[in-house]
A protein has these predicted regions:
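Intrinsically disordered, low-complexity terminal regulatory regions
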Residues: 1-23, 27-29, 148, 152-156, ...
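Regulatory sensory and allosteric helical modules in signal-transduction proteins
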Residues: 24-31, 38-63
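A short, hydrophobic, proline-anchored segment that marks a local hinge/packing element in signaling
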Residues: 71-81, 89
Length: 171
């Protein structure tokens, strides 16, 4: 899904993305780099409900699952019959997220704030409704908002596909 719909070369050409499915305890079931669910849950102090989808760009909020702010990490709790059964997650490298240089990869950065907008774990979807004001705030801090929106939509589509497949397997 992501390769067919993403716009940025980081995802389409360099395959700079990572899908993962984890069980209820947060242990990786499918993926290659390990699970960051525990770190994510420690950094997020709100509720986890059906219809939520979370976003972070903060490498410190997910046990280093992403290495810099250009990586947008999405996490989807998967519910079946009102009960949390698993998690789907994916990160994708965005082309530009603000910061002091185009591409948001300053080689001379002395602190993370020079890389671009740092987003702590937050609900970007509540009850399956996009929090458009939050996404627009993030996109307004990019030199490539159209690409980032398209790539974000590709990641969301991947989360929904993973959710559907996990629920099918659980039936």
């Amino acid at each position: 899904v992501v390769f067919r719909t993403a716009m940025s070369p980081g995802i389409r050409e360099q395959n700079d993305m990572f899908p993962m499915i984890a069980n209820l305890e947060g242990k990786m079931v499918v993926g290659q780099f390990g699970s960051f669910i525990h770190g994510f849950k420690e950094a997020y102090d709100g509720t986890i409900e059906e219809g939520d989808l979370f976003l972070t760009t903060d490498p410190y909020a997910c046990n280093g699952a992403i290495s810099h702010i250009n990586d947008w990490l999405l996490l989807r709790p998967i519910f079946k019959d009102g009960r949390l059964i698993a998690y789907a997650a994916m990160f994708g490298h965005m082309t530009d997220v603000g910061g002091k240089v185009p591409g948001s990869l300053p080689t001379d950065a002395r602190e993370i704030f020079e890389e671009g907008i740092r987003v702590p774990p937050l609900k970007i979807f509540k009850n399956d409704e996009l929090q458009a004001d939050v996404l627009n705030l993030i996109l307004h801090n990019s030199r490539m908002p159209t690409w980032n929106r398209s790539d974000f939509n590709a990641l969301v589509a991947a989360m929904r596909t993973a959710e559907k497949r996990v629920i099918e397997m659980a039936e």
